[in-house]
Structure formats: structure tokens, C-alpha cells
Amino acid sequence: MQVRWAPSDGSLGDYTYQQDMSSSDKLSADDVLNTLDKSNRHILTCILVCGLAWSPLAFTGLCPSFVVKASENSSFIGVADEFDLTGDASWLAESTTTFYMVGNMIGGMFIPPLADHYGRLPVFVATVLLMAVGGMISAFSTSIMMFCIMRMIHGIFYTAAGLAGWVLGYENTPLRLRFFTSVYFGVMWVVGACFLGLLAYILPDWRYLMFCISVPNIFVALLIYMTVPESLHFLVSSQQNEKIEAWLEKIRGPKGDISASDIVEDRDENGSSFKTLCREMWKHKMFIVYVLVMTYIWIVDTFIYFGLAFYSTNLAGNLYLNFVLMSLVEAPAYIFSPIFMNKYGRKVLISGTHIIAGLSFLGIVLSSEAWHIHFWLLGKFAISCSFMSIYMFASEIFPTDGRNKCIGFCETLSRFGGMLSPYLSHLTAVHALAPAITLSLIAVSGGLLTLILPETLNTKLPSTIAETASRRQLIDDKSDSSSN
């Protein structure tokens, strides 16, 4: 039996079912998932629970907005207040976020391979639990250095939990539900961010806040362990036939017509060795340009996104309301970005949203203070659209034989933008509008550089670096032939 799911019109999320019976054919894990009904309760539970974990992840990633140093007009007690980090020592408060981003880089490099070896589920559960423990211990820090170290540990497990949770949920999702899965994960992040603002209002002390935002991870980890199955893709790739049979019986029912022997591993995702990849890149210099441009865009988006999140509590007005509004504006970005990408193209959307963000920040410089919050919100919406889209764009630009390595390279280096983001507020010492001017210039530069990249809408995924490097010419040839 052969099962295929193909886009009926080239768009994401719109798939037509085609089945061709042939007993000699083998199925991939995706083929098996696509035979499941979209209302399958086990799959829906997996999606809902894995996405639910992103709410407490938002607690961890965005808590510096309050914990480090809240607005001077606020009664919130942050680490800068408790440890008297003022004057020449004020930089130590922001360094807690730098330590956190360093932890992100470490976790991103060393823990994902454990998920490939031991499984997505155990790594997901373990890292979520360790996040809870690390967060609760950090609430009892006796010095700023102890807090920095605990934040770095937090960062290590945050990245691993986020990646493992996303991969586990995505790999257990049929193709026709992956659009919904992407939107749901993003919305749950927004829900977590909004709850963080509410908790900070109720608990205006960094110790109480850190402890309370860490506890939910314990319950989430237990819920994951009790309800979420291991990734079928992982079980197939590791050839665990007994567990595959158990997975099939649980998810598809005891009377299913597919067995472990019918499923084969899709091996084209393993990619080339690092040495081979470097050799191919040297042959095709344009591909190196694509990697550098994509890395720069990733750094820009990380810097602006976290910079806005952390800086929102320094804006005029109620810091809690400002933070919640900055978070809520992400929800429509996560919902509409995939639609805009399929209608106007990846490059147009990402370049355009960077330009819109840049103009929004420029509007802050040119307008009265009453309009500032509106321009900040528009800028946050635009950069959230780009951040949502860049993962798909990168997956379609980078070829199969180097996709994981290239995306990992971009993701890791993007944390340098995260390291710099907490220092955005320090630019007010130069001029009150210096943060807005800086963000505007950086956003516009990212938008203009995006134009160097090839459009990937309605094109098949490249298999080799040579295909990616020549893609611009291929698209030009295709457009010329269609016009004739």
C-alpha cells in the first residue's frame, strides 16, 4: 500500500489524499501519520500538550522584562534593586540575560543530539523538569553571580525543551494539521507571555515571580509523560520495531492494517558530513552569501524581538499593560504570516515586514509621545511576522544535504543578537530616541539584505548546494518561459 499526501494547489495545509495499493511498497512515517483521521484523539492530545508547554517556556524567555530591572515608576522589586546594581554596577543586571543567551547556545549545540539518540520524549520531559528545578533554585539566589549561573542553566534547558517539544509535536502531526500546529504553538507562546505580565502585576517581587513561573513546568512535564507518545519518526529511524507496533496499536487501533515491517526510514534528512558541506560551499560562493545573509537576518530578528520585549517595561504608561499589549500583537502575526507567505512569497513578506518595522521605529522619532506605543506595537507585529516566517524560508533555501547544519548555524549565532538586546535601554543615555533609531536602522538593513535571497514560493526543496546556488537563475528562466 502506498499513501501520498500532495498539495492540491501548492499551498501549505491544503492536501489531497491519494492512495495506491501495492503490497510491495513501503511507507514512511509521514505516510502512516497521513492515514490517521484528523480527529484522532491521541494525535490531537499530542499537539495540544506539546504546544501547552510553550506557555511556561515564554515565562522563562521573557521574565527578564520584569526580573532584571523594571521601570523606575514601578513598585516591582527586581534583581537590580535587591542587589543594588546601580551606577558602574548596573551592567551586571543585564548580564543575567547575556548568561541566559549563552546557555541557549550551549543547549542548542549539545542537547539536541541526545534527542536523536535517546528519543524526543525523554529529553523533552527531562529538560522541562530541569527548567522547573533550575528556576526554583534561582529564586533563592544569594548573589547576582549565583543568579547569572542559574539563568545560564535555565537557558541550556530552555532551548532543548523548546526544540524537543516542537520536533515531538511536529513529527507526530499529519501534514494536513501542521499549519494548525504551527499557529497553535505560537498562540500558546502569546498566552504564556500575557500570563507573565499578569503574574508580575500580582507578585511584584522577582523571587516570588521566578518561583511561581517555574512550578508549572513540573505539572507540564508530568502531563507530557502521561499523554504524549514518542515520535514515530524517531522510532522508525532507530528501528525499534516493538515500540512501533505498540505505537500503531495505540494510535491507529488494534485492527490496523499497517505493521512495523511496512514502514521504512526516510534517510534523506541526514545530510552530508561537515567536511563535504564546506567543500561544496567553497565551490558555490553564492551559497556562502545566502548563509551569511540568512544568519544576519536571524541575528537582527532575535535582537529586535527580545529587545522590544525587554524594553516594553521602560515605555511610558503602565508597564504591565504595555508588556501584555506587546505580547498580544504577536497572535495575529502567527496566524496571518503563513497566509501572506503563500500569497505574496517568502522573500516579499520577510523583506516587507522588516521595512515596515523600520518605518514604525522611525515613526517614533518623528511623532509625538502619544503615538509612540502604537508605533512600538506595529513594529513588534512586523518583526513577529518575520520571525515566524524565517524558519520556513531557511528550510526552503538550504538544501537537504546541509539543511540541519545551516539552520543550526543560523540559530546558534542569532543568540548574539539576544545577548545584546538587554542593553538596548542603555542607549537612552545617549538620547531618549536612540533605541528607536537603532532598531529602525537594523530592521531596514535586514529588509534590504533579504532581497539578495532567492524566492522559494512554489519551488521544490533543493537537494544540493548547487541547486540552491543556481536557484535565482532557475526562477528567472521559469518566469521568462511563462511570459512567452
Curated annotation (Swiss-Prot):
Coiled-coil regions listed in the entry: none
Pfam families on file: Sugar_tr
Leader peptide range in chain numbering: none
One of the record's GO cellular component terms: membrane
SUPFAM superfamilies the record matches: MFS general substrate transporter
Membrane-crossing residue ranges in chain numbering: 43-63, 95-115, 121-141, 144-164, 183-203, 208-228, 286-306, 321-341, 348-368, 373-393, 433-453
GO molecular function: transmembrane transporter activity
Superkingdom, natural source: Eukaryota
CDD domains, sorted: MFS_SLC22
Main location: membrane
Compartment(s) where it occurs, according to its Swiss-Prot or TrEMBL record: Membrane
Topology relative to the membrane: Multi-pass membrane protein
PROSITE patterns xrefs: MFS
Keywords, comma-separated and alphabetical: Membrane, Transmembrane, Transmembrane helix, Transport
Gene3D superfamilies in the record: MFS general substrate transporter like domains
Sequence similarity: Belongs to the major facilitator superfamily. Sugar transporter (TC 2.A.1.1) family.
Protein name, UniProt field: Putative transporter B0252.3
